[in-house]
Amino acid sequence: MARLEVPRPATFVTLTGFMGVGKSRIGRELARALMLHFIDLDRYIERRTGISIPDIFRHLGEEAFRRMEKEAVRELVGKDYLVLSLGGGTFMDPESQKALLGRGPVVALWASPETILERAMRKPGERPLLQVENPLERIRTLLEARAPIYRKAHIHVSTDGRRVEEVVEEIVEKLWRHAEARGA
């Protein structure tokens, strides 16, 4: 049976950005809007390993987790009809970054450090990198270090003070513009 082809601006979209910017929630809705599958990289790793991300960090360390991320990206970059939501640090790996930038549009989601902290604190204990005395300062430091890498994305969208639907609408609009600019 032939696959029904519907017009869409891309068949593989990556969402990147710092933790707490809304990649997972927005990714699910974006996938629905584009009629694509959705994979959250952290959940994918948890399913494959049978271990939660906080437990991977706690028992195996960040380095082991980053290797798992890299391997998962290598595997998923070959898929089609997919919105892939990365973990906050995944795009920092040069090999993963190159593969994803070459595969399809990469969308960087942004939010202020205060918004990120407020969102992250909704699920205390789920953000291993924020288990420090001053999480807001940690967010600012990490965000400052990662921002130049996130800026390599094709598309940039702020999620501060916005509904998921608004953000998805802006992403779809920018994906179409990106596709048109590339002659797709």
UniProtKB/Swiss-Prot annotation:
Gene Ontology terms: cellular component: cytosol
Name of the protein described by the UniProt record: Shikimate kinase
Cofactor(s) the protein requires to work: Mg(2+)
Cofactor note: Binds 1 Mg(2+) ion per subunit.
Alphabetical list of InterPro entries matching this protein: P-loop_NTPase, Shikimate/glucono_kinase, Shikimate_kinase/TSH1, Shikimate_kinase_CS
Domain of life of the native organism: Bacteria
Assembly and binders: Monomer.
Record keyword rRNA-binding present: no
Binding-site list for Mg(2+): 24
Family membership noted in the UniProt record: Belongs to the shikimate kinase family.
